[in-house]
């Protein structure tokens, strides 16, 4: 993919950019793999906001992605199309299996129209093939990695993401995640060879707030600019710094770390590097 930059015809256009979408081969999705995606506005079944900063945005249909590929072991599939997916940053590939079934997978880098991919323990080590970590050479770059055998891909699914298999000992393999975290994963877990395509997506400049609204993202307002009724940091004459340790809108201390009592925490070899606190 490439990035197309706009000329500064308006303040919102100045500096903004968009993908050129040259890798896409079809503009309409496979209807049999679509399901409705109702808008929630961040509300739950009682109508209360459970997730802030969500609302509006363009209407979308959810594409059913095959994150497991277990039941297609040994069945070759040809990549029929590379398509756009509004629900994720990565592109998706439509597979036509030899038995006639059609499925979507996340499109790996280097996999295009006409490429043949296959899943299973005996698959070759080439981009797009899916096989257990026990059958993948150490040092290989993979993506769409499972956390538990049979649970479906959970890690390394966004545009440009790659996970490296750095070691294998006993019944566990050690992988390095895009965040820098290193963790152990059962060697029966599956991964797809190669890295996710559309890596240039991170360089897109959205240009104006409205483009985020098209994606269903509402503004994030700081507590210190609110009124006292709306946030513990609100109020005061003129600009204030808050006057207390950072808290959530409900008074809970902010900046908490991960739950150290989580069962899977023992599998984390090295934590991700955290950014500078501001």
UniProtKB/Swiss-Prot annotation:
One cellular-component annotation, GO: large ribosomal subunit
MF annotations from Gene Ontology: rRNA binding; structural constituent of ribosome; transferase activity
Record-linked PROSITE patterns: RIBOSOMAL_L2
Keywords tagged on the record: Ribonucleoprotein, Ribosomal protein, RNA-binding, rRNA-binding
Region annotated Disordered, chain positions: 1-20, 225-278
Methyltransferase recorded as keyword: no
Compositional bias ranges of the Basic residues kind: 258-278
Domain of life per record: Bacteria
Gene Ontology biological process: cytoplasmic translation
Function, as annotated: One of the primary rRNA binding proteins. Required for association of the 30S and 50S subunits to form the 70S ribosome, for tRNA binding and peptide bond formation. It has been suggested to have peptidyltransferase activity; this is somewhat controversial. Makes several contacts with the 16S rRNA in the 70S ribosome.
Stated family: Belongs to the universal ribosomal protein uL2 family.
Assembly behavior: Part of the 50S ribosomal subunit. Forms a bridge to the 30S subunit in the 70S ribosome.
Record-given protein name: Large ribosomal subunit protein uL2
UniProt source species: Cutibacterium acnes (strain DSM 16379 / KPA171202) (Propionibacterium acnes)
Encoding gene, per UniProt annotation: rplB
